[in-house]
């Protein structure tokens, strides 16, 4: 029978790049919509919700996707990753609720934080299925999911905010959008992958369970936690490093200034998404080169990745220097452009 043939690294990168470009563009579009339909305070509330939930979710995710995609020797089944992710996500949501109440956030702000936490929980489950597709270099299907999620999220946020005039209904639309993509596309990706490998006469060891059900074997879960815990801690610290300025900014100056800061800073986030797409596409190939002791191919690919990332960074700096103020005026509002100095 024919063996499974992965799509080329170039096509994987193309799919991932296009998917992440559309998704990051739509995320940026959410800030634009809130800036156009609302005000900087509304942008600030949304940003605060992301800032409060991010460290908790980053820690609870334990970077399982990276471990999953680089598990070239299949030490764990997909079901193990899914089982652990459900446990950690189930623990993260009450922690977000406790932080929201303990820090004194009330009313609209508290509701937005909790809703964003729930949306991030749904996203974390999708992330395990993305890891499965990425591990087997099926980036096209993962990219399609992201390309559907981005525009649908933007549409639902826009409709909810426009009709109600409140960010709460906009964020609720975001939750609905992410739940729909998880149920109609991401979860069925497991069966799609099984069917694809079955038709090609090859079932990888990582899909040995044949069902997309979580597996909770205490010994396996414990080993996976100890393996991934350092990565989770590092990602939490990275998230805190990025978000602590937002906490202090909101506390000392208010949500308006936080909203302006978020709008300006998102241009950097958009650039990081492109670099992330590059790394995501190449990571499984790098892992195989490393596991196969192919040092020459590993170093060549790594050098190419670094060169592309540097070129993208320099391009972003040039655009900001030449037309930063004009871009902010057109995309957001004139009041945002005065902060370019």
Predicted regions and their residues:
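Interfacial transmembrane-helix starts/ends
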Residues: 9-10, 44, 73-87, 221, ...
